[in-house]
């Protein structure tokens, strides 16, 4: 679509976004660099906030743009503008802006080139400024002291509000083969944690005692790894294991009638798993005899959703664990068994789906538990 000039194009884009649901809008629309910063880049923030910057660099937020799964998904259709607003939430990160839809079709956006597009900033995905900059002003939780740049104290940073702009996004698009089913916020709201005063920040950004910036006093700050399933977006790039304790609690005991398994959603304030409907968690039990040979058939329990995507998305089942929900099983003992191995793992997608998308070498799963039980 023909440009009407940078200012007019920005105004048209803002008007369009204002007409859309929250999760279809960018988090920040301004381009003004806050006083005290050299640029909007994470590296500019990281010059002082060194530990936070190092945590962010290996987080899934930092890899939200270059994630290979995301790249193949947005290449399928002209609906990518729907996804950009969470994966690259600043307008300066987007090469084109939607200013309207042809026949109200989300796959036929009217686009104008963004004259302020910053490719390097786009590569940072969900970067510092995505959450902390609003119209040229740095926002934060308010730690006190005398920061070298102005900070607007913002209560959203102590609540779930910022997170749910993207992690509570549910929508159907009739006649389309895609849907948006990120219901994490509602899952949390329906669970026990709100009454206990715990929100997204409480678990996903645990407290640490350290300076917020170089030369500052030791104080209570928040870690910026954002706890999750622990499946890397890029092989070898991930937070340390302690940053992602598994949501699943798992115990196993050998009894006369079989191996007793107890599985509980112990640490996730939402369903386990949550978010992407293709994710699942599984528990597998295998048996061996005294010679180390496999006996009997493996037993498996899967926690996840079942969907078909053609001709329209349809959900067929949901076996996920609600917050603090527990389930117990007795796995029969095969003849000759003397040892049982219980392995739990978290999965991003199936090998079949990864093959379809030509995602060879893409990290698909992570083991979370391995238990050995004997009589």
Where do the PLM segments sit?
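Short glycine-enriched loop/turn motifs at secondary-structure junctions
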Residues: 38-40
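Long, hydrophobic/aromatic-enriched structural stretches that serve as scaffold segments
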Residues: 86-89
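Active-site neighborhood of thiol-dependent amide/isopeptide-bond enzymes
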Residues: 81-84
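Short, aromatic- and glycine-rich surface loops/edge beta-strands on solvent-exposed regions
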Residues: 283-285, 337-346
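Primarily the internal scaffold of c-type cytochrome electron-transfer domains
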Residues: 2-36, 55-78, 92-322, 328-333, ...
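A long-range scaffold signal marking pre-active-site subdomains of enzyme folds
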Residues: 42, 50-54
